[in-house]
Design a protein with these regions (language model features):
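Nucleotide-activated chemistry modules centered on ATP-dependent adenylation/adenylyltransferase
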Residues: 2-198
Length: 198
């Protein structure tokens, strides 16, 4: 398995690691480097990413990065912050995130001076789901998993993207077979806005 895909390396190990001068650059190398790729290929990919995000920010006056605070998203955050792009950054706090994940946002804010906006599920909906189906009911069936995701992810995402004309994700083709054909840019018909998957 590729080192990029391991949980330990896909997130910052600590707040201190997130604030080190080269932490994001090291993540960029980990994200963009495939087996035996020379550094020049990485530089070209970073340049292409910078160009894409710059063009997206100039094309859309209301654009947002949906950040999971994983390595891929932190590379995007770094580019947005360094280039001072008008792309707001948000994350979904599902109520089930690990503390290490939660610690990344303030570290990024401290390093770059750019805020990560948090969107959470409606407390009443979560409470009803947990009380009637159980805290971990999403393990029991596909229907319960989809219901939980609807409450904890889909609805908060809809609020986070309200008013946006485009959004950016950290999804990668290598993450899953279902993402193998993930386009760089697509129209998100569910939300009626453009979507970038750099």
């Amino acid at each position: 398995m590729n080192a990029v895909n391991t949980s330990a390396q896909s997130r910052f190990h600590s707040v201190e690691a997130a604030t080190e001068n080269n932490a994001v650059q090291e993540q960029a190398i980990a994200v963009f480097r495939g087996p035996h790729q020379p550094a020049t290929d990485i530089a070209a990919k970073v340049q292409a990413l910078e160009t894409l995000l710059t063009q997206a920010a100039s094309e859309f006056d209301s654009i947002a990065l949906a950040s999971s605070l994983a390595a891929e998203d932190n590379v995007l955050f770094d580019v947005i912050a360094r280039l001072k792009l008008n792309i707001r950054v948000f994350s979904l706090n599902t109520g089930r995130l690990h503390q290490q994940t939660l610690d990344v946002a303030p570290a990024l804010q401290a390093k770059y001076g750019q805020t990560v906006a948090w969107f959470e599920p409606q407390a009443a909906a979560v409470e009803t789901y947990v009380n009637t189906k159980g805290r971990d009911a999403f393990y029991e069936s596909t229907a319960l998993r989809k219901e939980c995701c609807g409450i904890r992810k889909v609805e908060p995402l809809a609020r986070a993207l309200q008013g946006a004309k485009a959004w950016v994700t950290g999804q990668r083709q290598a993450q899953a077979a279902t993402r193998a054909e993930l386009p760089l840019r697509e129209f998100d018909a569910d939300r009626g806005i453009e979507k970038f998957n750099p």
